[in-house]
C-alpha cells in the first residue's frame, strides 16, 4: 500500500518556508511514514512591495494564490501566520488547526537605541502595520513613521543601511529565523497591543476535506485556539483586517479568558481601548461583546474615517 502523503502550499519567503517545514515536521512526528511535500508559491502580496498593504487589498493577498493552488489540486493544505488570516475565510475553505502560540509581542529592532522611548525627536521608524503605526504615534507623535515592506531580511538590511533609526517586527518571526539577537526589546501589550492571532500558525484546507482535517487535528493547540477565537470574535464584529489599526490580545487564566482590544486612528490622535473577562467556553462571544463595546464608544467612526483615507 502506498504511503499517505500531504502537499503543503507556502509562500517562498524564508520565514514562510520555516513555518511550513515546522508544520511538516510536526505532522511527520504525529504520523510516522507520512510523506510531506512543500509547494512554494509566489503571492501578489510578496510581489508588490512599493505600496502599503491596505492600498492593494490587505493581507488576503498573501493567501489567494495558495488557496487557488488548493482548488486546482496542487496542494492539500496551506500554512499561514494567523495574523494574516482574515476573520472571514473565502467560501470553500476551513481553518483546520491552530498551532501552539509563540511570543505574540512586537519587537523593537535598532542598532543604536534600546527602546521606543529612547528614540530622539523626529527619528524614523519603519513598519508595514497600521496597528503598530497607530500605537507608536499615540505614544510618540514626534516620530516619523515610514512604510517598510519586504521579507524580514530585506527589512533588516534597510535598517542596517541607515534608512531607519528603528523598525518594528513580530518577535516570533525573528525568533523562528534565529535572529533573536537583533531584538533590542520586546514591546509589552501595554506599549503595543499585538495583532489578532500574532505568534500562532494557522492551517487552512478545503472545506469538507475530512482526510486532511483528520491528519492535522493533532496539531490544534486548544488553549491557543480559545485565545484566538476570542480575538477573532472581536475582529469579526469590527469587520477588521490589516487595513485598519486594530489590536487584540487574549490570555487564559484557568477557565477564564481575558481579552484586550483597541481601535485607533492611523495618526494616533485617538485610540479606543477596552477589555473583557469571562468563561473560556464563551471566548468567541466575549470577543464579539468587546467589539460591540468598542463600536459603541466610537470605533465605528474611526473605522469609517480610516476607510475614507484609503
Curated annotation (Swiss-Prot):
* Molecular function terms from GO: hydroxymethylbilane synthase activity
Residue numbers carrying S-(dipyrrolylmethanemethyl)cysteine: 242
Q: Does the keyword Transferase apply?
A: yes
Query: EC number(s) in its UniProt entry?
Result: 2.5.1.61
User: Keywords assigned by UniProt?
Assistant: Porphyrin biosynthesis, Transferase
Q: Which family does it belong to?
A: Belongs to the HMBS family.
Additional remark text: The porphobilinogen subunits are added to the dipyrromethane group.
What name is this protein filed under?
Answer: Porphobilinogen deaminase
Origin species, per record, is Halorhodospira halophila (strain DSM 244 / SL1)
Gene giving rise to this polypeptide? hemC
Amino acid at each position: 500500500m502506498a504511503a499517505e502523503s500531504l502537499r503543503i502550499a507556502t509562500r517562498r519567503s524564508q520565514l514562510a518556508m520555516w513555518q511550513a517545514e515546522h508544520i511538516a515536521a510536526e505532522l511527520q512526528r504525529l504520523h510516522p511514514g507520512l510523506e510531506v511535500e512543500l509547494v512554494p508559491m509566489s503571492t501578489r502580496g510578496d510581489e508588490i512591495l512599493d505600496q502599503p498593504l491596505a492600498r492593494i487589498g490587505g493581507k488576503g493577498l498573501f493567501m489567494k494564490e495558495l488557496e487557488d493552488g488548493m482548488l486546482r489540486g496542487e496542494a492539500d493544505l496551506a500554512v499561514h501566520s494567523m495574523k494574516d488570516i482574515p476573520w472571514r475565510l473565502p467560501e470553500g475553505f476551513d481553518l483546520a488547526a491552530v498551532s501552539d502560540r509563540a511570543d505574540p509581542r512586537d519587537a523593537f529592532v535598532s542598532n543604536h537605541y534600546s527602546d521606543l522611548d529612547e528614540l530622539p525627536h523626529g527619528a524614523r521608524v519603519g513598519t508595514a502595520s497600521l496597528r503598530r503605526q497607530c500605537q507608536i504615534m499615540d505614544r510618540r507623535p514626534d516620530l516619523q513613521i515610514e512604510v517598510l515592506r519586504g521579507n524580514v531580511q530585506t527589512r533588516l538590511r534597510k535598517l542596517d543601511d541607515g534608512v531607519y533609526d528603528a523598525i518594528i517586527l513580530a518577535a516570533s518571526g525573528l525568533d523562528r529565523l534565529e535572529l533573536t539577537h537583533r531584538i533590542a526589546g520586546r514591546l509589552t501589550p501595554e506599549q503595543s497591543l499585538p495583532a489578532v492571532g500574532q505568534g500562532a500558525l494557522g492551517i487552512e484546507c478545503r472545506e469538507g476535506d475530512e482526510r486532511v482535517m483528520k491528519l492535522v487535528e493533532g496539531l490544534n493547540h486548544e488553549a491557543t485556539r480559545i485565545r484566538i477565537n476570542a480575538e477573532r470574535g472581536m475582529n469579526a464584529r469590527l469587520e477588521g483586517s490589516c487595513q485598519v489599526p486594530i489590536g487584540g490580545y487574549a490570555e487564559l487564566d484557568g477557565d477564564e479568558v481575558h481579552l484586550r482590544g483597541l481601535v485607533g486612528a492611523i495618526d494616533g490622535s485617538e485610540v479606543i481601548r477596552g477589555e473583557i473577562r469571562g468563561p473560556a467556553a464563551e471566548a468567541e462571544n466575549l470577543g464579539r461583546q468587546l467589539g460591540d463595546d468598542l463600536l459603541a464608544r466610537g470605533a465605528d467612526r474611526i473605522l469609517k474615517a480610516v476607510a475614507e483615507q484609503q
